[in-house]
């Protein structure tokens, strides 16, 4: 298939970013067994505060935690293997160690070149670039973890609670720093 066929352009790695909120309850997940999966998670409080700056948030499904956990459990139960889980905070607090660990788990050679990149837009950024990547486009490497908005307005508490239990479960499987 287009998602799990031959790797394009004779590359050794074919990275695909999938957004879990696009996976519906009726979606067939069998194709996920044909690729190596890695789950990148982030604290729901941080996600909510970021998301509401750009989009109207009406329910927890928009953030994808339930769907991410569904995919994770499907893979764990159907393959007998625990998929790799990375916490974004851990990556930002120690990018080299986290990327070395990720590469080791995925069978990819780590190089220090993975820790930096040229600033600017990329052909591979896709349709979401204008919505999410403006800050990333200014960077040349991982920025130190910084989260100053530790509060969450009360109106988001229900959505936060719905996401938190799924996040906590996924986080319990994260690759430790």
Question: Which residues does each predicted region cover?
Answer:
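PAPS-dependent sulfotransferases, especially Golgi type II membrane carbohydrate sulfotransferases
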Residues: 109-177
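PAPS-dependent sulfotransferase catalytic domain
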Residues: 19-113, 127-134, 138
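Membrane-anchoring alpha-helices and their flanking helix-loop junctions
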Residues: 13-19
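Active-site donor-binding segments of glycosyltransferases and PAPS-dependent sulfotransferases
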Residues: 1-13
């Amino acid at each position: 298939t287009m998602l799990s066929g031959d790797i394009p352009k004779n590359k050794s790695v074919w990275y695909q970013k999938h957004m879990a909120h696009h996976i519906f309850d009726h979606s067939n997940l069998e194709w996920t067994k044909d690729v190596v999966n890695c789950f990148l998670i982030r604290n729901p409080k941080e996600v909510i505060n970021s998301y509401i700056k750009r989009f109207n948030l009406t329910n927890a499904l928009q953030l994808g935690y339930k769907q991410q956990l569904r995919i994770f459990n499907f893979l764990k139960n159907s393959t007998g293997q625990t998929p790799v889980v990375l916490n974004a905070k851990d990556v930002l607090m120690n990018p080299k160690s986290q990327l070395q660990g990720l590469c080791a788990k995925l069978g990819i050679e780590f190089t220090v070149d993975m820790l930096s990149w040229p600033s600017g837009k990329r052909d591979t950024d896709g349709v979401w670039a204008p919505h999410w990547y403006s800050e990333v486009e200014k960077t040349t490497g991982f920025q130190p973890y910084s989260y100053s908005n530790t509060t969450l307005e009360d109106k988001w508490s229900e959505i936060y609670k719905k996401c938190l239990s799924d996040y906590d479960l996924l986080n319990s499987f994260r690759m430790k720093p």
